[in-house]
Amino acid sequence: MAIKLIVGLANPGAEYAATRHNAGAWYVDLLAERLRAPLREEPKFFGYTSRITLEGEDVRLLVPTTFMNLSGKAVGAMASFYRIQPDEILVAHDELDLPPGVAKFKLGGGHGGHNGLKDIISKLGNNPNFHRLRVGIGHPGDKSKVVGFVLGKPPVSEQKLIDEAIYEAARCTELWFKEGLAKATSRLHTFKAQ
């Protein structure tokens, strides 16, 4: 099944743009830039969108302008309008359980406490079987510090690692369309920025 919608999760507004919780949007922004397809605000989809062609496949890009916990509103609207099935969607999000410098593809699973994923699962009819790109941001080490951590900006050294992982993820996304998910996954999962 080809991917028809790539989503980058984020909170809207300049004050959140550089926070760890917006790592998914950094990836979609990079894809849009690499493929010369600038994102434009499209109110009916509650987000910034663009249309790209990857290996002959028509793909939509989406960065919701809702707050993170309402991401499903944007994803659901676009999936419904274009008749896109959950397994044709790739959602990029920040991942506490991976260190900065690592990104991994995954199909399905729970939301792991991520409010963006939780809302998307709910708005897709409680179907969790969409693809994810998990962008490692690391963990603060204490559950009570998670909210402040994801809404904080990474130090320059960590930002560099996250950016490198996102670059590799963008290259591997293009590889996925060229040579399949298995090859793309194998390459991405052996990458670790130094």
From Swiss-Prot:
Record-linked Pfam families: Pept_tRNA_hydro
A GO molecular-function annotation: peptidyl-tRNA hydrolase activity
InterPro entries referenced in this protein's UniProt entry, alphabetically: Pept_tRNA_hydro, Pept_tRNA_hydro_CS, Pept_tRNA_hydro_sf
Catalysed reactions, as listed in the record: an N-acyl-L-alpha-aminoacyl-tRNA + H2O = an N-acyl-L-amino acid + a tRNA + H(+)
E.C. code: 3.1.1.29
Keywords: Cytoplasm, Hydrolase, RNA-binding, tRNA-binding
Subcellular location: Cytoplasm
Enzyme class: hydrolase
Gene3D superfamilies: Peptidyl-tRNA hydrolase
GO cellular component: cytoplasm
Principal cellular location given in the protein's record: cytoplasm
Top-level division of the source organism's lineage: Bacteria
Binding residues for tRNA: Y16, F67, N69, N115
Gene Ontology biological-process entries: protein quality control for misfolded or incompletely synthesized proteins; rescue of stalled ribosome
Positions annotated as active site in the UniProt record: H21 (proton acceptor)
Keyword hit for Hydrolase: yes
Residues annotated as site: Discriminates between blocked and unblocked aminoacyl-tRNA: N11
Feature type site, description Stabilizes the basic form of H active site to accept a proton: D94
Protein family (similarity comment): Belongs to the PTH family.
Function: Hydrolyzes ribosome-free peptidyl-tRNAs (with 1 or more amino acids incorporated), which drop off the ribosome during protein synthesis, or as a result of ribosome stalling. Catalyzes the release of premature peptidyl moieties from peptidyl-tRNA molecules trapped in stalled 50S ribosomal subunits, and thus maintains levels of free tRNAs and 50S ribosomes.
Quaternary structure and interacting proteins, as annotated: Monomer.
This protein's name: Peptidyl-tRNA hydrolase
Organism: Salmonella heidelberg (strain SL476)
Gene encoding the protein: pth
